[in-house]
């Protein structure tokens, strides 16, 4: 013999599930006429690409961006009123940036490493030496930097200047 309470519970559960599914598929309705709210633009996913001396690598790891008040006594000194610090890395590359909120953004400092095959390009974190050494642009949460930096290359003595480019989109 079937327990009638068990049958009622199944029927109520199935009805609730059906109402939930129907509610999720129906568009919202309103008694007010007029256009609905415009669809929001999808935000770009966090990403970073680094280029050193013609070699390009897309970083597959996490991109972290943190904005805080600029610290004039930091080394290197931070310009603007806010500083965005960007860190992105994976097994083959890493990027560390300090960018001001100026328009266009000032680059307070940068560090880049990129391993391509047996060559390991290392630009230790360094301040920008001149206004034309590194140029940056910002569009929304995306930054593009191009310039030259002092790099150490294993197997070579001393540091040398290398061209680089970075494109990063913050989350």
UniProtKB/Swiss-Prot annotation:
* Matches recorded under InterPro entries: LpqH
Cell membrane: is it a keyword of this entry?
yes
Q: Where is the lipid attached (S-diacylglycerol cysteine)?
A: 29
Membrane topology, as annotated: Lipid-anchor
Q: Which UniProt keywords apply?
A: Cell membrane, Lipoprotein, Membrane, Palmitate, Signal
Q: Which gene encodes it?
A: lppO
Q: Where is the lipid attached (N-palmitoyl cysteine)?
A: 29
Annotated signal sequence is: 1-28
Q: What is the lineage of its organism?
A: Bacteria, Bacillati, Actinomycetota, Actinomycetes, Mycobacteriales
Question: Protein name, please?
Answer: Putative lipoprotein LppO
**What are the subcellular locations of this protein?**
Cell membrane
Instruction: Please provide one cellular component term from the Gene Ontology annotations of this protein.
Output: plasma membrane
């Amino acid at each position: 013999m079937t327990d009638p309470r068990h049958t009622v519970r199944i029927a109520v559960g199935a009805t609730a599930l059906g109402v939930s599914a129907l509610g999720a598929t129906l568009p919202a309705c309103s008694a007010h006429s007029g256009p609905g709210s415009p669809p929001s633009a999808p935000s770009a996913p966090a990403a970073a690409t680094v280029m050193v001396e013609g070699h390009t690598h897309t970083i597959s790891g996490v991109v972290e961006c943190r904005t805080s008040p600029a610290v004039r006594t930091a080394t290197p000194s931070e310009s603007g009123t806010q500083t965005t610090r960007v860190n992105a890395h994976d097994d083959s590359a890493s990027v560390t940036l300090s960018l001001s909120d100026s328009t266009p953004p000032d680059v307070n400092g940068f560090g880049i490493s990129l391993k391509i095959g047996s060559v390991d390009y290392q630009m230790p974190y360094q301040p920008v030496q001149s206004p034309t050494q590194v140029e940056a642009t910002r569009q929304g949460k995306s930054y593009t930097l191009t310039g030259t930096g002092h790099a150490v290359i294993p197997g070579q003595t001393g540091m040398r200047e290398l061209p680089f480019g970075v494109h990063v989109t913050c989350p």
